[in-house]
Amino acid sequence: MRSEVVGAQLGEEAISSSLKAAAIGLVIVMIFMIVQYLVPGVVAAFALAIYTTLVIATLYLFEITLTLPGIAGIILSIGMAVDANVIIFARIREEIADGKSVATAIETGFARARSAILDGNITTLIAAAVLGLRGSGTVKGFASTLAIGIILSMFTCMVVTKVLMHAVYAIGVRDAKFYGKAKERKPFDFVGKTGIFIAISCAIIVCGCVGVG
């Protein structure tokens, strides 16, 4: 058995560094979303800002102490929130590419993305519940912030983002070019390159065995 004692100052510095890294990562993600998805990306950036504010307010309201595992849970939930927005925007682009109006594409895009988002988030929420019930103190901290983040991310992506998208359309941003173009799907011949993938897998296994040995 191994144990470590970490001083209060070192713990505070670690938490502060983690929060700064999370903030920088969030800003980078926002910039990427704006560049990649144009108007929907701007909407996603606002939604993520609202989401982050809601998470902080919820932690303060329930007096949840922020720890390193807790920060990890928040960062993971932010990633899931971004993933949900990406799914929605991809569906909207597909609808626009099929010739539908922007208004119809927005409504249909959210409807098509709903099941995938709910499935992924509910599965993770169940895992967080199990960790919270069966885990130790630090694991429970991770599970609690992850659960809070998932619930709030579902709310922001399915409600807040949708309201903002309709608001942007209502104020006059209705040209399809501002919502991006769907990328053409190029088929990849996995079966034809089976030998290459087997060779790569074997090389990785050998390297892993050598590293462990």
Which role does the model predict for each range below?
Residues G41-E63, I74-A81, F142-C157, I205:
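Small-residue-enriched core segments of transmembrane alpha-helices in multipass membrane transport
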Residues I96-I122:
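Helix-loop junctions and hydrophobic alpha-helical segments within the transmembrane domains
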Residues F155, V159-G208:
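Interfacial helix-loop-helix hairpins and adjacent transmembrane helices
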Residues E63-T65, A127-S144, V212:
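Transmembrane helix-loop junctions at the membrane interface of multipass transporters and ion channels
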Residues G25-I34, I196-V212:
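Single-pass alpha-helical transmembrane signal-anchor segments
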Residues M1-A8:
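A cross-kingdom feature of multi-pass membrane systems that activates on extracytoplasmic/periplasmic
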Residues S77-A97, I117, M154-V159:
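Short helical (or helix-break) motifs at transmembrane helix termini and adjacent helical loops
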Residues E12-T67, L133-G137, G192:
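Interfacial segments of transmembrane alpha-helices in multi-pass membrane proteins
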